[in-house]
Amino acid sequence: MADHDIHIIGGGLAGSEAAWQLAEAGYHVRLSEMRGGGDMTPAHQGDGLAEMVCSNSFRSDDGDSNAVGLLHREMRALGSIIMREADATKVPAGSALAVDRDLFSGGVTRALSEHPNITIVRERIDKLPTEGLTIVATGPLTAASLAESIGAATGKDALAFFDAIAPIVYRDSIDMDIAWMASRWDRVGPIGDGRDYINCPLDKDQYYAFVQGLLDGEKTEFKDWEKDTPYFEGCMPIEVMAERGVETLRFGPMKGVGLDNPRTGRWPYAVVQLRQDNALGTLWNMVGFQTKLKHAEQVRLFRTIPGLEKAEFARLGGLHRNSFIRSPELLDRQLRLKSAPHIRFAGQITGCEGYVESAAIGLVAARFAAAELGGRALPPPPPETALGALLCHITGGADASSYQPMNVNFGLFPPLADDVRKKDRKLGYTQRAGKALAEWMTVAAGVAA
């Protein structure tokens, strides 16, 4: 007889959240994670659970007017370990929720390691289990052997996209006689003071020279089988954005609007922002600067940015290929694989995009599995909630033939009544979601009883 009630494969944000939810519901979990067992992915740097690779940001924490902030709120209400540890390890980031990555991963790892209902096994799983309840949360960097097994079980090749990583700079190597601290419009966040970002200003000539440098810079070459792989729009390499037009960056990650340079009293023509990456404030990441430039080229070009002339880099940018399944075609509304319903999928492998979204789907998958283990059925969260809207997109709301990774956004929610004014719509979505979640939680409590 198995020593566990359910097997979770993958110790990223989705798998960690799923393990916590099931353990808290009283079920024994076997959590398999290949990192720390002799294997590593192309993007991870350590073996901690819930390691954040591309960014330290959970994006906006505004639950009244932002869809991802609403998702934060819903997950907190449902006892999310990911949100608990994010709140415990947050660093100043304006109205966004950003964390110290190492403290965050350490907190999640410690919580799961100490839970009496969770057994963490450092092992690589090469094939989908043929029996026993399972949640596959291996993320976009699933081991090739398991990816082949998934393809065989689904009859479908995995879909893929490219994801990019932004560089991290040592704080003491930034020239603060040129750069300055400020948040856009001096916005004060939950733990900040309206001065949460380091801003490096560029004038018109410097900006155009920088863009030309991006276009001319030597870039990572793709293998033949990678050349038709698209980029994810939400994590686009900065040089690819520059290829879309010389002004693209100035109206994107390098926009100077709302940032008064204290030395000129004016907004800069363009700006490079850096966000605190750890609690000590010693590491800062370049916001929106995901890149596939070769490392030597990154150092040369980024040191042409005013204030970063002597920058020392703790990590340079990079590119990795992410895989996901065609979820709307392959999964039912309970995230079960239609061809093998003892298996659920969760996290980024389902085609949701973003750390929070990944953890949210892990949470929902675990709730469904807990109900099934108890011999009951839990209805999906209503589509009016952020959890439900994201779930609907993954399990049928999207066109399976053109399915691509998606962040949570209000476009996934059912429309509001026509008489709601445009300026009131975001609050309308979030208020409606709050009522719908409360009703669903009442139903869920009855199912768990």
Swiss-Prot record:
Q: State the source organism's domain of life.
A: Bacteria
Q: What start and end residues bound the annotated signal peptide?
A: none
Q: Name one GO biological process term.
A: tRNA methylation
Q: Which UniProt keywords apply?
A: Cytoplasm, FAD, Flavoprotein, Methyltransferase, NAD, NADP, Transferase, tRNA processing
Q: Where does FAD bind?
A: G10, G11, G12, L13, A14, G15
Whether Ribonucleoprotein counts among this entry's keywords is no
Q: Does the keyword Lipoprotein apply?
A: no
Main localization is cytoplasm
The cofactors required by this protein are: FAD
One GO term of the cellular component aspect? cytosol
The reaction(s) annotated as catalysed by this protein in its Swiss-Prot or TrEMBL entry are: uridine(54) in tRNA + (6R)-5,10-methylene-5,6,7,8-tetrahydrofolate + NADH + H(+) = 5-methyluridine(54) in tRNA + (6S)-5,6,7,8-tetrahydrofolate + NAD(+); uridine(54) in tRNA + (6R)-5,10-methylene-5,6,7,8-tetrahydrofolate + NADPH + H(+) = 5-methyluridine(54) in tRNA + (6S)-5,6,7,8-tetrahydrofolate + NADP(+)
Disulphide linkage map? none
Class of the enzyme per the UniProt entry, highest EC level: transferase
Identify one Pfam family in the record.
Answer: GIDA
- GO molecular function list: flavin adenine dinucleotide binding; tRNA (uracil(54)-C5)-methyltransferase activity, 5,10-methylenetetrahydrofolate-dependent
Which locations, inside or outside the cell, does it occupy? Cytoplasm
Q: Which family does it belong to?
A: Belongs to the MnmG family. TrmFO subfamily.
Function per UniProt: Catalyzes the folate-dependent formation of 5-methyl-uridine at position 54 (M-5-U54) in all tRNAs.
Provide the protein name: Methylenetetrahydrofolate--tRNA-(uracil-5-)-methyltransferase TrmFO
Q: Which organism is it from?
A: Sphingopyxis alaskensis (strain DSM 13593 / LMG 18877 / RB2256)
Quick one: which gene encodes this? trmFO
